[in-house]
From Swiss-Prot:
Chain positions recorded as UDP-alpha-D-glucose binding sites: 280, 347-349, 364-372, 386-389
UniProt function note: Possesses low quercetin 3-O-glucosyltransferase activity in vitro.
GO molecular function term, any single one: quercetin 3-O-glucosyltransferase activity
Protein name per the record: UDP-glycosyltransferase 71B5
Keyword field contains Glycosyltransferase: yes
Species: Arabidopsis thaliana
Gene3D superfamilies associated with the record: Glycogen Phosphorylase B
Pfam families: UDPGT
Length: 478
């Protein structure tokens, strides 16, 4: 009899890819395991995510990995600056998810063993309970921020403090998942905002009800944060550090622009190019664009810069390419840097990071981007823009010595609609530091890359955690 798990990912590219990759790793580790991935369509036109969903549902090559799409009424584009949060949208799909699962498990050769839900789909634990099976969670960020969220919720429920009342304060707080005090003003908007905090608290309470949490991290990368879950015993779910879960496929090999970028990198000396890329939601204002260009000009470094125009509201609209770079870049910049740099709209990040020419990575600190950089042994400059990225940056710089900060305590959050402009001086300084060839940061990253690779091998910590999860799933079946 097949053991069936139901996966419910969030329909965003940064969540879909690691979830599907994890599902493939699981069925590759246990022959009796079968997985159905419930695809909930994106609320709006999600670009890459929609394309990813389409490719997944048409290219499934393993009969033990099944994709089941549910139908959702397409919502028209909205001008509402604060659309319905993802968690609320997902919760509204419970009935359709329940029906899809019920239709799937009529097969007598399959026994439903549990749900594995995305961190933003935690409300689906209610559906798992209806089927009488355990609910596990995939946490696509890191153990440090997972611990931060749970601690904020615990302090609130125990009436010790309300973190939203400390907004804009210089107060530092102790978090069990961090070794150093953390400045409250650098917590994400979802925790410090009176409007968003209740949703985050409800989410954290739901996390605590999970049977276990699969975290996209490595035991050797976050030993202190993971210790928090070990010493709390029954108060917190079992955590399985199974990372790095990475999507390392290199996209469309026939794309001429992509091929040109990669050919150019092949022509550059080893570790000579600084790569600037800020994720699917990262865009720059004209002022920030000019400051960055001045920094690159003065630094003298070779560079590959993914530049897009900031969206007026990233909750509803993605950044777009600049139509005329010469209008926003300093006069003569493109001509002066023609032989040592490229300004592009988009790049295949993984394919770029694995090139020997890349010597440093200026990143928005999305967790997937951090893991990719560590995997390829590329030291980072942290330039956090939104969500938990300031916590990620703090961990990389202050806790682990794996990155250089663009500047200390960067103000603003793209989700809140405002970001501090970083000066050319700060950017140039950070770029020069990260490109140093024998720095402690570079050596630390090289060592961590080796640990990340070994973690996924036989005898490695992440491989062992994955096997432990499978064992627990089987033991938790009725």
């Amino acid at each position: 009899m097949k053991i069936e798990l139901v996966f419910i990912p969030l329909p965003g590219i940064g969540h879909l890819r690691p979830t599907v990759k994890l599902a493939k790793q699981l069925i590759g580790s246990e022959n009796r395991l079968s997985i159905t991935i419930i695809i909930i369509p994106s609320r709006f036109d999600a670009g890459d995510a929609s394309a990813c969903i389409a490719s997944l549902t048409t290219l499934s090559q393993d009969d033990r990995l099944h994709y089941e799409s549910i139908s959702v009424a397409k919502q028209p584009p909205t001008s509402d600056p604060d659309p319905v949060p993802a968690q609320v949208y997902i919760e509204k799909q419970k009935t359709k998810v329940r029906d899809a699962v019920a239709a799937r498990i009529v097969d007598p050769t399959r026994k439903l063993a549990g749900f594995v839900v995305d961190m933003f789909c935690s409300s689906m634990i209610d559906v798992a309970n209806e089927f009488g099976v355990p609910c596990y969670m995939v946490y696509t960020s890191n153990a440090t921020f997972l611990g931060t969220m749970l601690h904020v919720q615990q302090m609130y429920d125990q009436k010790k403090y309300d973190v939203s009342e400390l907004e804009n304060s210089v107060t530092e707080l102790e978090f069990p998942s961090l070794t150093r005090p953390y400045p409250v003003k650098c917590l994400p908007h979802i925790l410090t905002s009176k409007e968003w905090l209740p949703l985050s608290l409800a989410q954290a309470r739901c996390f605590r009800k999970m049977k276990g949490i699969l975290v996209n991290t490595v035991a050797e990368l976050e030993p202190h944060a993971l210790k928090m879950f070990n010493i709390n015993g029954d108060d917190l779910p079992q955590v399985y550090p199974v990372g790095p879960v990475l999507h390392l496929e290199n996209g469309n090999d026939d794309d001429e622009k992509q091929s040109e970028i990669l050919r150019w990198l092949d022509e550059q000396p080893s570790k000579s190019v600084v790569f600037l890329c800020f994720g699917s939601l990262g865009g720059f204002t004209e002022e920030q664009t000019r400051e960055t260009a001045v920094a690159l000009d003065r630094s003298g470094q070779r560079f590959l810069w993914c530049l897009r125009h900031a969206s007026p509201n990233i909750k509803t609209d993605r950044p777009r390419d600049y139509t005329n770079l010469e209008e926003v870049l300093p006069e003569g910049f493109l001509e002066r840097t023609l032989d040592r740099g490229k300004v592009i709209g988009w790049a295949p990040q993984v394919a770029v990071l694995e090139k020997p020419a890349i010597g440093g990575f200026v990143t928005h600190c999305g967790w997937n981007s951090i893991l990719e950089s560590l995997w390829f042994g590329v030291p980072m400059v942290t330039w956090p823009l939104y969500a938990e990225q300031k916590v990620n940056a703090f961990e990389m710089v202050e806790e682990l010595g794996l990155a250089v900060e663009i500047r200390k305590y960067l103000k603003g959050d793209l989700f809140a609609g405002e970001m501090e402009t970083v000066t050319a001086e700060d950017i140039e300084r950070a770029i020069r530091r990260v490109m140093e060839q024998d720095s402690d940061v570079r050596n630390n990253v090289k060592e961590m890359a080796e640990k990340c690779h070994f973690a996924l091998m036989d005898g490695g910590s992440s491989k062992a955690a994955l096997e432990k999860f499978i064992q627990d799933v089987i033991e938790n079946m009725d």
